[in-house]
């Protein structure tokens, strides 16, 4: 697990930082107790698990079916990715 701090730059957003550091948006939010938009100069704590992978949701897949395949819970998948539901083509972190 790689752990470090990052200073938010002008134009940074949660989605872009999530992709840049391969960390789910939900994890960034919870690690940093975020309740508002990011501002330039904010310091974020980043924990990146190199084992984490990006997964594209397939046709007719649900959080439950994906959770069963990857030995996790639907709640964790939804929470880590800061979404209420999954849909075809959505890229999520597992």
Pin down the residues of each PLM region.
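Primarily a LysM-type cell-wall glycan-binding module
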Residues: 1-21, 42, 47-70
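Extracellular LysM carbohydrate-binding repeats and other cell-envelope/extracellular binding modules
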Residues: 24-56, 73-94
